[in-house]
């Protein structure tokens, strides 16, 4: 199928690649859009922006951040879909169409992380939207006044400080694979939401490479009435001490 320019806004050009994909281009910067769902090829976009700024910024790096993980959780809740459905991997077809496609709502968050300039522009666009109508203004201030702090980060910090007071040691100990929540004379401690227990065990094993003589300890919060049997089996098998902190 031959390419054709479908529409143009000032210097922004939209090109139909085929019936499914469209390329949106501004000068030498472009994005690939999946017309079926509006998802955008974030792999390609991050690569292009990284070359422009001379510093590698990848989607994988963004996704590893604690804040990013919580943003993904919140987006899934708002859209009423599973987290997995926010991402689509395209591994076949023309090379330029391959990569990780993500929900358009996440694209703004990723580029916000990459570019302070873009973040500032988004803030001003929101301000423009707020001023457009009293209804918009009401929605804005309602969201602003009811904004919830990061539960995971807040709770982790509370537990971290209590354990530091109890056991002593050092918090946020930096390693090549991440930061240890709390390290004492004989323990490396990871604090995690129940639903992220697998991540926590993986982190403990990564940290234990640097501190092989220290005991691996996992503190879980937000457990409630959830089943711990499988977690206990895994922890026992891999010599991880499990504690519940609810």
UniProtKB/Swiss-Prot annotation:
Q: Which PROSITE patterns match?
A: KILA_N
Example GO molecular function: DNA binding
Q: Which InterPro entries match?
A: HTH_APSES_sf, KilA/APSES_HTH, KilA_N
Transmembrane ranges?
none
KilA-N domain: residues covered: 20-129
Q: What is this protein called?
A: Putative KilA-N domain-containing protein L33
